[in-house]
């Protein structure tokens, strides 16, 4: 009689990857101190999530904790310091999905919940719906006893100056969505996202954003749309996207990566690169994505000059980067 693996079950690989936006970022646009600030915050967020995984926490707990750190930082386009819509207000979107049961939750256009990702998580667990929007989503978050703030909490002086400048250029008949100067165009490509796989092999993906600077009031991008900006399936992968959301919606980018793996048998790297560098670019879409497959392999693919990103896994990967390298 042969007993195999009794008491020696192989521990699954754990991994976490995050992005904080893809866009027209070049080294000459940032001081050394600014680069250090970004890399420090990305590393901090990554390590908080990884520690949760390391201590037997779930991938869902890891993704939410990581995104909250990014939402609470004014460095990124999510939560406090996010970009502003045409009405000079923060209208934020977020979503989360578990690959184990494909349950998901999302909110769009929230203005009062301090951490939009927690509202999306509350929808996942405590609502029969997948997505809530606007004041109804804020009211739901408040009823769930999540931390609420005044809309002014999210507005920084820097973002207010940016929106005023863009509105003035709009009045001067500048086509902001096609001909914006590069100094401003990176504001269109915010978003933060996290994908993680825990010791149980469960994948979770989550995304949070302020959307597009000077967007029309109540515009909704890909971030809260399950299958477009966020997707997770334990059979294939978890994906979180960043970029010009309209293109990601049209291609259902996050789900497309999973579908290529499931139905064509492609590996993660081939699927992500094909979607980002072929399918997206064929229709003029700019941006990127992060992904983790069921084996814990990580992909960070983007077709812009840069993407704020970081990753860590139990197989030794430990990285943080901003620019194309």
Sequence positions of predicted segments:
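Alpha/propeptide regions of enzymes that mature by internal proteolysis
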Residues: 10-325
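Bacterial Sec-dependent N-terminal signal peptides
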Residues: 1-11
């Amino acid at each position: 009689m042969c007993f195999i693996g009794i008491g020696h079950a192989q521990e699954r690989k754990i991994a976490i990857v995050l992005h904080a936006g893809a866009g027209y970022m070049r080294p000459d646009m940032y001081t050394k101190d600014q680069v250090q600030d970004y890399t420090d915050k990305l590393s901090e967020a990554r390590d908080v999530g990884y520690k949760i995984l390391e201590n037997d926490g779930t991938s869902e707990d890891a993704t939410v904790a990581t995104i909250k750190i990014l939402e609470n930082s004014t460095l990124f386009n999510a939560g406090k310091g996010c970009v502003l819509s045409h009405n000079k207000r923060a209208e934020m979107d977020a979503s989360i999905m578990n690959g184990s049961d494909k349950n998901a939750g999302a909110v769009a256009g929230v203005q009062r919940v301090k951490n939009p990702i927690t509202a999306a998580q509350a929808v996942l667990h405590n609502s029969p719906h997948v997505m809530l929007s606007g004041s109804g989503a804020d009211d739901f978050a408040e009823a769930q006893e999540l931390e609420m703030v005044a809309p002014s909490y999210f507005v920084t002086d820097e973002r207010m100056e940016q929106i005023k400048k863009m509105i003035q250029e709009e009045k001067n008949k500048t086509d902001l969505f096609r001909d914006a100067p590069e100094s401003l165009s990176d504001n269109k490509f915010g978003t933060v996202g996290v994908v993680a796989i825990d010791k149980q092999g469960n994948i979770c993906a989550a995304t949070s954003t302020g959307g597009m600077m000077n967007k029309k009031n109540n515009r909704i991008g890909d971030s809260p749309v399950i299958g477009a900006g966020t997707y997770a399936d334990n059979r294939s992968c978890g994906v979180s996207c960043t970029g010009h959301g309209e293109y990601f919606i049209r291609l259902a980018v996050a789900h497309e990566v999973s579908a290529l793996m499931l139905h064509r048998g492609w590996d993660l790297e081939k699927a992500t690169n094909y979607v980002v560098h072929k399918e997206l670019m064929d229709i003029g879409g700019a941006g990127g994505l992060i992904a983790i497959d069921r084996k814990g392999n990580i992909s960070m693919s983007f077709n812009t000059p840069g993407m704020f990103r970081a990753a860590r896994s139990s197989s030794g990967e430990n990285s943080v980067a901003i620019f194309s390298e």
